[in-house]
């Protein structure tokens, strides 16, 4: 993916495979936040953070409260106080927060501090990162109990829903991703940081599709999920803007999962699929394959060769060249090869280069199966993009590749549609009633911002929204009978794309399941490289 300097910071924090238009959307949020007006979400806001002696709601107590009144993005007033917890602060907590027993010795008690906080807050809307934690500690005593009646907005929910393609939604990572003031894990510093990213989060919600924001706004009543109020207010803003632009009351459409998937693959958002970029012929055992000469492979691993040019610190390794030539020989003679190589040899590039060159020149497909999904992701998101770029620059060809994992790694659109129809419920998690609304909202937003990537990086609490309710199995899949079959389906859409790819990367589990299913699960593939083969036996079905 080509990125300019404007996108570099955000790009470093998005998950691998994030579509270019989504990266651009994220990169524009800071600028949008500077000029937008978010109405009631931007006025009479108090951003709050607390520090405590630990994370136990029953045993631990407050050590610091910090709050800032926010008016249209500007801090107008501060409230900061240490709190005497009535017990020693553990050393590890002091090390984390830089708050010591001497700091709190003469501080107000939790009840006194929360009374002062309540007077400062008044009827303002409260914003906190992981709001349930702060809300519990400031309202569990008589001094702050009245703050239960205020509207609480969880900025962590907003981040996970509006920015699902970020690698992390911790406050410190949001600060870095959007170049906001840096948090030092003191409550006042964290409040300042949250003040800096709060409007960016509102911009991110505003940038979501109108019908999705509207649907999320109605997922749960405010008493079950108070952060839903943000989506209700922004949905109203979006309707108002649409009406203003149209000159009359804008027509609203019900949320459609199918329409959302089609939009993701619209010409404006979607680069040409692999089928238009690659020429992979129908597979046949009689189809001749053309591979490079051994001398070409050897030259590629020289400092100024195809592989050598990929790395600034490249050092030729004899073992890597020997392995690459042996892989080439095995391909050329259609024989099996077992290779054992030590750490640091560069095994993956030693088999990827001859695989890529052979697949490109022959219009065929070569597969790679890894033991772990971590290695699979490294190959697909790190090594193959580098190889694709250098092969294109050298005029060798446009290498296409696809990763395929098992059904359980991808959301099933049919099951997601059932979730959409059923709406959010309250579920009991470790003795607490929790709404499914934020999890459903994050799932739908991820689907909207994703082409065919797996959901392994999606931050969902599967105790709230079980994974089996989102994913399917080969037995459960309705295949052509499913209304989402084809390009809208993560699994079958990705499989269709794989049919035109030069290199197919999968894991041992799916590779051996495909063998057992006599090739039903994966597209026909002429040659296979089984990496980490010493662990293959454990994956046999």
Feature-to-residue mapping (PLM):
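Acidic two-metal-ion nuclease catalytic site recognized across multiple nuclease folds
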Residues: 2-37, 199-294
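Conserved non-catalytic scaffold segment of RNase H-like nuclease domains
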Residues: 4-151, 164-185
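Acidic, Mg2+-coordinating catalytic module of metal-dependent nucleases/exonucleases
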Residues: 122-142, 161-237
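A substrate-engagement module of RecA-like helicase motors
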Residues: 275-287, 294-298, 303-308, 370-502
């Amino acid at each position: 993916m080509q990125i300019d300097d404007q996108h570099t910071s955000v790009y470093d924090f998005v998950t691998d495979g994030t579509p270019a238009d989504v990266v651009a959307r994220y990169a524009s949020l800071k600028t949008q936040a500077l000029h937008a007006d978010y109405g009631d979400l931007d006025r009479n806001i108090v951003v709050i953070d607390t520090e405590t002696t630990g994370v136990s709601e029953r045993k631990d107590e407050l050590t610091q409260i910090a709050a800032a009144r926010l008016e249209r993005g500007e801090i107008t007033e501060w409230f900061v106080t240490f709190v005497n917890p009535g017990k020693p602060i553990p050393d590890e907590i002091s090390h984390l927060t830089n708050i010591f027993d001497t700091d709190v010795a003469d501080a107000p008690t939790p009840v006194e501090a929360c009374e002062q906080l309540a007077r400062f807050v008044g009827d303002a809307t409260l914003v906190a990162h992981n709001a349930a934690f702060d809300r519990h500690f400031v309202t569990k005593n008589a001094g702050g109990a009245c703050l239960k009646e205020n509207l609480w907005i969880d900025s962590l929910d907003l981040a996970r829903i509006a920015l699902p393609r970020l690698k992390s939604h911790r406050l410190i990572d949001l600060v870095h991703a959007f170049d906001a003031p840096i948090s030092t894990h003191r409550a006042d510093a964290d409040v300042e940081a949250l003040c800096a990213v709060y409007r960016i989060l509102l911009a991110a919600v505003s940038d979501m599709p109108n019908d999705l924001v509207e649907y999320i706004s109605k997922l749960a009543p405010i008493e079950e999920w108070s952060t839903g109020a943000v989506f209700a207010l922004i949905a109203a803003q979006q309707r108002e803007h649409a009406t203003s632009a149209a000159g009359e009351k804008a027509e609203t459409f019900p949320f459609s999962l199918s329409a959302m998937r089609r939009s993701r693959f619209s010409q404006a958002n979607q680069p040409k699929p692999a089928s238009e970029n690659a020429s992979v012929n129908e597979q046949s055992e009689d189809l001749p394959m053309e591979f490079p000469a051994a001398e070409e492979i050897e030259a590629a691993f020289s400092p100024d060769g195809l592989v050598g040019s990929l790395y600034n610190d490249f050092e030729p390794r004899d073992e890597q060249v020997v392995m690459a030539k042996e892989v080439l020989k095995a391909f050329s003679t259609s024989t099996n090869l077992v290779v054992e190589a030590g750490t640091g040899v560069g095994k993956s590039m030693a088999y990827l280069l001859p695989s890529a060159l052979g697949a490109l020149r022959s219009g065929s497909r070569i597969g790679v199966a890894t033991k772990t999904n971590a290695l699979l992701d490294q190959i697909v998101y790190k090594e193959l993009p580098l190889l694709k770029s250098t092969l294109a620059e050298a005029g060798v060809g446009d290498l296409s590749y696809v990763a395929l994992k098992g059904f359980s790694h991808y959301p099933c659109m049919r099951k997601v549609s059932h979730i959409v129809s059923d709406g959010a419920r309250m579920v009991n998690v470790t003795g607490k009633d929790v709404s499914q609304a934020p999890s459903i909202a994050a799932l739908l937003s991820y689907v909207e911002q994703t082409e065919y990537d797996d959901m392994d990086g999606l931050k969902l609490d599967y105790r709230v929204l079980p994974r089996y309710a989102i994913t399917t199995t080969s037995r459960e899949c309705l295949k052509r009978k499913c209304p989402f079959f084809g390009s809208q389906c993560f699994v079958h859409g990705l499989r269709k794309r794989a049919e035109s790819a030069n290199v197919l990367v999968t894991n041992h589990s799916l590779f051996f399941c495909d063998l057992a299913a006599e090739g039903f699960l994966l597209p026909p593939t002429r040659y296979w490289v089984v990496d980490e083969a010493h662990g293959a036996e454990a994956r046999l079905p």
